[in-house]
A protein has these predicted regions:
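Solvent-exposed serine/threonine-rich low-complexity stretches and specific carbohydrate-binding patches
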Residues: 110-122
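Accessory, solvent-exposed terminal regions and/or long lumenal/extracellular loops of proteins
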Residues: 1-111, 125-129, 136-152
Length: 152
C-alpha cells in the first residue's frame, strides 16, 4: 500500500477554486520528529480561461506546522521517507463541478487525455450530480511540485 498510486479529487467551489492537503509518514515510528514525512498542498485556482491545479511542498515553507507538538527548525524534502515514495504517482485527477468541458488539459508541454461527463457546475443553482472531468495518468508524482492547466 505504501507505493500504491493516488487519485486526487478536486471539488470546485462556487468561485472555481479548491484546496486540500496530504500528510504522510510511515505510521509506525516516531521518525516524523526528525522530519521523515511528506506534507503536500493542493490548490485549484480559476481565471476566465483556465483552471490551474498545483501541488506544492508545504513542509519546506512551514516545518513547524506539519506535526502537532513537534518543532522542526528545518525540513528536507529529500528525507528518507519522501525518497522511499519517489516514483509513487498520481494515477488520476478527478475535477468535480466544471461548467463546460475543457478544450485541452496540459501538464507542462504535454497534452493529457481526459474524459468529461456533463453535470451540474459548482457555481450554478441547479441540483443534481456534479460534472466530472477525469484525467488519467497525468505524469505527476505525489512527492513532486507540479501543475496541470485546464483550458476552458
Amino acid at each position: 500500500m505504501k507505493r500504491d498510486p493516488f487519485t486526487l479529487k478536486v471539488a470546485l467551489s462556487q468561485s472555481g477554486s479548491a484546496s486540500g492537503e496530504l500528510y504522510l509518514d510511515d505510521g509506525e515510528s516516531y521518525n516524523h520528529r526528525e522530519g521523515n514525512f511528506v506534507w503536500r498542498g493542493f490548490v485549484a485556482e480559476s481565471t476566465k480561461k483556465t483552471i490551474t491545479i498545483a501541488s506544492k511542498d508545504l513542509a519546506s515553507k512551514n516545518p513547524n506546522g506539519a506535526v502537532d507538538g513537534v518543532e522542526l527548525t528545518t525540513y528536507n524534502g529529500g528525507n528518507a521517507f519522501a525518497n522511499a515514495l519517489n516514483g509513487v504517482r498520481v494515477e488520476r485527477v478527478v475535477v468535480l463541478g466544471l461548467k463546460n468541458k475543457p478544450s485541452k488539459v496540459t501538464f507542462g508541454n504535454t497534452h493529457l487525455d481526459f474524459t468529461f461527463e456533463d453535470g451540474v457546475a459548482a457555481f450554478g443553482n441547479k441540483e443534481g450530480v456534479a460534472s466530472k472531468l477525469t484525467i488519467k495518468t497525468p505524469g505527476a508524482f505525489i512527492t513532486s511540485d507540479w501543475t496541470i492547466v485546464l483550458e476552458l
